[in-house]
Swiss-Prot record:
Belongs to the heat shock protein 70 family. Molecular chaperone implicated in a wide variety of cellular processes, including protection of the proteome from stress, folding and transport of newly synthesized polypeptides, activation of proteolysis of misfolded proteins and the formation and dissociation of protein complexes. Plays a pivotal role in the protein quality control system, ensuring the correct folding of proteins, the re-folding of misfolded proteins and controlling the targeting of proteins for subsequent degradation. This is achieved through cycles of ATP binding, ATP hydrolysis and ADP release, mediated by co-chaperones. GO terms for molecular function: ATP binding; ATP hydrolysis activity; ATP-dependent protein folding chaperone; heat shock protein binding; protein folding chaperone; ubiquitin protein ligase binding; unfolded protein binding. Coiled coil: none annotated. Residues 3-388 are annotated as: Nucleotide-binding domain (NBD). It holds the Pfam family HSP70. It comes from Rattus norvegicus (Rat). The keyword DNA-binding does not apply. One of its GO terms (cellular component) is plasma membrane. This is Heat shock 70 kDa protein 1-like. PROSITE patterns: HSP70_1, HSP70_2, HSP70_3. CDD domains: ASKHA_NBD_HSP70_HSPA1. Signal peptide: none annotated.
Amino acid sequence: MAANKGMAIGIDLGTTYSCVGVFQHGKVEIIANDQGNRTTPSYVAFTDTERLIGDAAKNQVAMNPQNTVFDAKRLIGRKFNDPVVQSDMKLWPFQVINEAGKPKVLVSYKGEKKAFYPEEISSMVLTKMKETAEAFLGHSVTNAVITVPAYFNDSQRQATKDAGVIAGLNVLRIINEPTAAAIAYGLDKGSHGERHVLIFDLGGGTFDVSILTIDDGIFEVKATAGDTHLGGEDFDNRLVSHFVEEFKRKHKKDISQNKRAVRRLRTACERAKRTLSSSTQANLEIDSLYEGIDFYTSITRARFEELCADLFRGTLEPVEKSLRDAKMDKAKIHDIVLVGGSTRIPKVQKLLQDYFNGRDLNKSINPDEAVAYGAAVQAAILMGDKSEKVQDLLLLDVAPLSLGLETAGGVMTVLIKRNSTIPTKQTQIFTTYSDNQPGVLIQVYEGERAMTRDNNLLGRFDLTGIPPAPRGVPQIEVTFDIDANGILNVTAMDKSTGKANKITITNDKGRLSKEEIERMVQEAERYKAEDEGQREKIAAKNALESYAFNMKSAVGDEGLKDKISESDKKKILDKCSEVLSWLEANQLAEKEEFDHKRKELENMCNPIITKLYQSGCTGPTCAPGYTPGRAATGPTIEEVD
């Protein structure tokens, strides 16, 4: 792979998970790994045959706990006799030894004992992140910005830099995680004068609160506080204990000593916890958990909040401490930024918001990606990316939801995709659905769902006075234009007459709040699979209807009068009418039924059309390879490919 000199990546090297991003084509891309995950476990495992990094390592931890290393970030840059190392050692299933005052991890690899420095373990994770980026970019990458907690001392920073070097990276800079998060939100741009930012970072294994002041692009850390042992894993532990007790009650058996059962339960608990951030209840189904007993149960969000109540409430203490240390009143904080996957928990957000008297929280960037996002921006700036996008990137806003209009069948046709930087302008050509249709109704929606009924209607207007023409002939040009203030102008123009109409939608009227946007985006993810099926179903229905209409009009064509026998013509027309009336009665049929009907119709029509073609027919139906085109179902307008 040839290296691309001008490209640099940003890496968030986390205690439990890591994340990598790159700035290209005017925006930051957070890069998914080979498993399709945008965050990668900071785990390295050694077996008799191989070394595993990331998801593969974490997935086998139950079978191989002594040789699966994680939490290297808790060791890096520390001495063996450091109290932190001594207390953490008691909790790890792997062995840590003392070599000349430095800690090393002892594992069995390919049948022999091997000791690794924390820098080496971290470098393996960094290598994985580097390879993830290279697979995405298609060329090798050496330049990187790596993030560390604000409280890391010089030796921890240097050790992290060394880990980068071991991984074959040229570390452009080590930057603080809270600074990266602030850069991601562009908080260093825009306002003149000093800004105070509180970064609330609740990750998988650690909790950090930082207060930064940003003045003219200069970042200063005023205070840090937190708990190096509070995070998502602690919430998982509470769930595990709860279910171990439940299993005891239901089945009179204690599973807590069975490592594999506990590990499987923990994995299910982590999944349930994530579900509870978007749903009020989660189900656990674990087959043959212990002694052949299936464990099927559920937990509500309220119960989860009760189990972790003291931990959640405890997150406010470091917030108060950091404000005291910074000698700052909470009213003086301009921005509150959420970082770390655990800040998705609604109760955590509510406690923080209530503490700051209902202030808005910055959470539009995925909280587990915000640090890598900022690191990627910083990397581009350090590489001298002079594009206006980098210089102004942090001034630019984005469209929080996709914007589009309703086309035939109630389908949402998107013109401006979610997270497009604004200002932006997109144009697409649409057409009429019925013959001699005098006008079209343009209905503007925002949302991520495939069907407009599930999205939010922003406004509608009519474009009238379209000259009579067959369906599909008029060309209606629709333009969506969002200016820098987020104001949307939608214009529709009939290209034949130049007649146009427009609507202006300002962002305060009928737009969704940040919370609703968050909720819709989460819902959309959940529904994406359903939507895909729905989209395929409508495409199949459209294809069938289109084929039937086109065959009908083709055999009714004056030019074909003498070329086709009345019986063939009747056969086609009858079959088309039968299909169209079946369609009327079966709007909600499955994709397979629509496809089956279309094949049936094609099998009947194709021999007749072929016969026509062989008899020297001319006209649209008779062009070689003719297949009636795709049209749409339903009311108003139809998309032209």
